[in-house]
């Protein structure tokens, strides 16, 4: 069994790798939203994608989701949960540094709850007869244009509209508080 302790980031998503012996690599992404930890994970062997899992862990109410990973068996998810309160939309907006009207706060609470419920619905999808694939659109990869740098012709016009310039860089406002740097 593999146990992963909680990892907290102040913003954004966390991506981590975990090797569990052999040639399997477990990769997971997780997001923290107002005390709710959403995650998506998959296990990949050297030959193909093995399993995909979605879930959530609530830290504000009695809700627990545990996943057991076995090389020989599919993932098994055990859940014990209770109805949890809607996320604090005002706090989420403050963390994202966006302003919301009282009407928007009222509208977004149920919508965020629906997203969390959607993760639960994904657990019920039967994928036993689905061929493993890393990408769903492998045919489109051959149609991509070559990745070649392009020189912008009107650079001086673009630079003229920049408020602060420290050659050769464009200076932008800080987005993190000084205590977080």
Swiss-Prot record:
GO cellular component terms given for this protein: chloroplast; glutamyl-tRNA(Gln) amidotransferase complex; mitochondrion
Catalytic activity annotation: L-glutamyl-tRNA(Gln) + L-glutamine + ATP + H2O = L-glutaminyl-tRNA(Gln) + L-glutamate + ADP + phosphate + H(+)
Organism domain of life: Eukaryota
Biological process per Gene Ontology, one example term: regulation of translational fidelity
Enzyme Commission identifier(s): 6.3.5.-
GO molecular function per UniProt: ATP binding; glutaminyl-tRNA synthase (glutamine-hydrolyzing) activity
Keyword annotations: ATP-binding, Chloroplast, Ligase, Mitochondrion, Nucleotide-binding, Plastid, Protein biosynthesis
InterPro entries: Asp/Glu-ADT_sf_sub_c, GatC
Places the protein is found: Mitochondrion; Plastid, Chloroplast
Quaternary structure (record): Subunit of the heterotrimeric GatCAB amidotransferase (AdT) complex, composed of A, B and C subunits.
Family, per entry: Belongs to the GatC family.
Physiological role: Allows the formation of correctly charged Gln-tRNA(Gln) through the transamidation of misacylated Glu-tRNA(Gln) in chloroplasts and mitochondria. The reaction takes place in the presence of glutamine and ATP through an activated gamma-phospho-Glu-tRNA(Gln).
Miscellaneous information on this protein: This protein may be expected to contain an N-terminal transit peptide but none has been predicted.
The protein's name in its UniProt record: Glutamyl-tRNA(Gln) amidotransferase subunit C, chloroplastic/mitochondrial
Lineage: Eukaryota, Viridiplantae, Streptophyta, Embryophyta, Tracheophyta
Gene name of this polypeptide: GATC
